[in-house]
């Protein structure tokens, strides 16, 4: 009888916690009377209208990326951001179960298929995993599986075993012989997936080598990250350390820190190697305890930008961080509450202050992201990948609450 009462008590406690969490989610996701999901539905419907207008004017891009003035900017499939918009639509299908989003996700994914054999870029994960990866996860369409496997095979052709990394850029040859950027860590998820699907250990070995080499060379003692490490492709030696999109080479570019947190959390999930978990936690500690981090946890574009607080924010860095923290909360029981509540606080800030007004900003969900400030590109604008990791964070939050 005592065991029976104990079981009932535990069940009641869990049910109460779940109900409280779900009510909290509804409350936090509301801005006025519109929930985060309803806001996204309306914005994406508006985005489809704006996309059609731009296409009718002769634009040749396949996917929305950002805005420039009052113009919706589209990109070709080869652009590193081309997979995010269809990824957003796959997430909308997952969040709503409405087949309308399924059909739209298929429509916007299709033009990106040709990238599966594009070997002159490292951005295969961003383009293919965010689009067809989510599509395969949700539909198990064998065609999507084939596209992803081919994409993974294409990606590893850029691996240099002497360096131990996948080459990032082919441009700026006058600056770097073999550049590797922190963003490239995000593409490893495609390789881990390909290993599990094919049992070909080459994918796994390349991913682990890249993760280990990056962990060795990209991070400073305080676990902030350089953006670009230049290698000698013949010897594997480091030749340059730069922060190309940050304030200075020794500064901490906010999105780069977020990529590091997210990717090493993912590497621990895929390998079980605790050194990756420790790395993720240390990067997270650097981010969350940095003296330049604002109270709302939406960082400035660079933690060392000289005119803080009069510097642009980068909402994309915040959404990547929130999504990573939700996952990290499932891996560290003693810090689960801390990580989840911190992610919740970021999402609450985004919903309260950084959400686009309905039927504005060409249908993007969030405002105030910064792409590449040193190049005077995409400053204080909506950017598609900020929306992507925001929706992913909403999904992860929902799953945790349930």
Description of each model-found segment:
Residues 1-31:
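Bacterial Sec-dependent N-terminal signal peptides
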